[in-house]
UniProtKB/Swiss-Prot annotation:
Family per record: Belongs to the actin family.
Name recorded for this polypeptide: Actin
Lineage: Eukaryota, Fungi, Dikarya, Ascomycota, Saccharomycotina
GO cellular component labels: cytoplasm; cytoskeleton
Keyword line: ATP-binding, Cytoplasm, Cytoskeleton, Hydrolase, Nucleotide-binding
Primary subcellular site in the record, as a coarse category: cytoplasm
EC numbers for this chain: 3.6.4.-
GO function terms (MF aspect): ATP binding; hydrolase activity
Function description: Actins are highly conserved proteins that are involved in various types of cell motility and are ubiquitously expressed in all eukaryotic cells.
A family per Pfam: Actin
InterPro entries: Actin, Actin/actin-like_CS, Actin_CS, ATPase_NBD
Localisation per UniProt entry: Cytoplasm, Cytoskeleton
Length: 360
C-alpha cells in the first residue's frame, strides 16, 4: 500500500495499493478511451481485464518505470498537487541498496522537479510516531518484515534483521489452505478476495496446539464470508493457521526464524547496555501486525526467550497500520527538520549521491 498526504496531518489523505495494471487484450472498441496503464484502486477495480504488477518486491523497488507511474498518480490524481511546489519526504526499507536511494532522489529532482527531498527509514518513523526515540521496531507490511533496533533516534545497522515473509505470503498461504477445503482461488483478481478474507477474519492464536484442539471439537470459531458472486464460504481453523506462519515460517517451507525469534535475535546482536531498553520498548508497526492476538502472543514468546529478570513490553498502537506515515508527518513538520532537507541547489551541485551524506 502507498500512503500519501501532507506534513502536520494526523492521517494520510490517500491510501492505495502499489500496483500498476495493464490491459491483457488490446481494446477492440475504438474511442473507448482505454488507457495503456492503470494505477492503484483503479487497477484494483478493473483487475478482471488487467495484468497486475507490483513494482515493489520485499520492500525494495524493482521496476522504476512503474514506480514513477505510482508517484505521478500520487501527486496529480490523489493529492492533486504540483510536485515542484512541495518538498517531498519518502520512506524506504532498512538496508535499501545504495543505488536505489540514488535513483529515488534522481527521479524526484529530475522528473518531478521537487524543491527539496528527504528519505527516511520506515521503522525509525514508526518509533517517532509512538513518542519514543529508543526501542526495537517490528515492522511488517505486504512484502517484507524488518526488525530494527533504534537507540536515541539512530538505527543500529548491525542489529537490523530482515524476514522475507509478510502479508503477501500469508495471503498466498491462505489461498493454498483454502484450496484444501475445496475453494479454489488462482488469478491475481481472486488473490485480492483472499486478502480481504485474511484482513477481516484471521487472528493469532495464543497457543497454537491448544487452538487446533479446541477448533477440532467445536465449530465456535467458524465464520462465513460472502464472495463477490454471492457464494458463501465457511472458514474455520484457517483463520489462525494462515497467520501462524509468522511464528513458524517452516509452514511455508521457509528456513527462517519467526517474528518472535527474529526480534530476540536482533536484541542479542545489540550491546548489553541497551538490551533492557529494547526489551521494554518492542513497537509493532505495519498492516501485517494488525491481527487480533498478535501482541499477546509476542509478549508470551519473547518473555519465554528473554532472561527471566527482563521486563518485556510490547507496544501495539491502534493506528500502527499508518504509524510510518504518521512519523513522517511529525518529522517533516518539526522546525528543526527544515535544515535537513536536500535542496534542489544541493542536488544540482552534488548529484544523486548527496542522499548518502544528508539522509542516514
Amino acid at each position: 500500500m502507498c500512503k500519501a498526504g501532507f506534513a502536520g496531518d494526523d492521517a494520510p489523505r490517500a491510501v492505495f495499493p502499489s500496483i500498476v495494471g495493464r490491459p491483457r487484450h488490446q481494446g477492440i472498441m475504438v474511442g473507448m478511451g482505454q488507457r495503456d496503464s492503470y494505477v492503484g484502486d483503479e487497477a484494483q477495480s478493473k483487475r478482471g481485464i488487467l495484468t497486475l504488477r507490483y513494482p515493489i518486491e520485499h520492500g525494495i523497488v524493482k521496476n522504476w518505470d512503474d514506480m514513477e507511474k505510482i508517484w505521478h498518480h500520487t501527486f496529480y490524481n490523489e493529492l492533486r498537487v504540483a510536485p515542484e511546489e512541495h518538498p517531498v519526504l519518502l520512506t524506504e526499507a532498512p538496508m535499501n541498496p545504495k543505488l536505489n536511494r540514488e535513483k529515488m532522489t534522481q527521479i524526484m529532482f529530475e522528473t518531478f522537479n521537487v524543491p527539496a527531498f528527504y528519505v527516511n527509514i520506515q521503522a525509525v518513523l514508526s518509533l517517532y510516531s509512538s513518542g519514543r526515540t529508543t526501542g526495537i521496531v517490528l515492522d511488517s507490511g505486504d512484502g517484507v518484515t524488518h526488525v530494527v533496533p533504534i537507540y536515541a533516534g539512530f538505527s543500529l545497522p548491525h542489529g537490523i534483521l530482515r524476514l522475507d515473509l509478510a502479508g503477501r505470503d500469508l495471503t498466498d498461504y491462505l489461498m493454498k489452505i483454502l484450496s484444501e477445503r475445496g475453494y479454489t482461488f488462482t488469478t491475481t483478481a481472486e488473490r485480492e478476495i483472499v486478502r480481504d478474507i485474511k484482513e477481516k477474519l484471521c487472528y493469532v492464536a495464543l497457543d497454537f496446539e491448544q487452538e487446533m484442539q479446541t477448533s477440532s471439537q467445536s465449530s465456535a470459531i467458524e465464520k462465513s464470508y460472502e464472495l463477490p458472486d454471492g457464494q458463501v464460504i465457511t472458514i474455520g481453523n484457517e483463520r489462525f493457521r494462515a497467520v501462524e506462519a509468522l511464528f513458524r515460517p517452516s509452514d511455508l517451507g521457509l528456513e527462517a526464524a519467526g517474528i518472535d525469534q527474529t526480534t530476540y535475535n536482533s536484541i542479542i546482536k545489540c550491546d548489553l547496555d541497551v538490551r533492557k531498553e529494547l526489551y521494554g520498548n518492542i513497537v509493532m508497526s505495519g498492516g501485517t501486525t494488525m491481527f487480533p492476538g498478535i501482541a499477546e502472543r509476542m509478549q508470551k514468546e519473547i518473555t519465554a526467550l528473554a532472561p527471566s529478570s527482563m521486563k518485556v513490553k510490547i507496544i501495539a498502537p491502534p493506528e500502527r497500520k499508518y504509524s510510518v506515515w504518521i512519523g513522517g508527518s511529525i518529522l517533516a513538520s518539526l522546525s528543526t527538520f527544515q535544515q535537513m532537507w536536500i535542496s534542489k541547489q544541493e542536488y544540482d551541485e552534488s548529484g544523486p549521491s548527496i542522499v548518502h551524506h544528508k539522509c542516514f
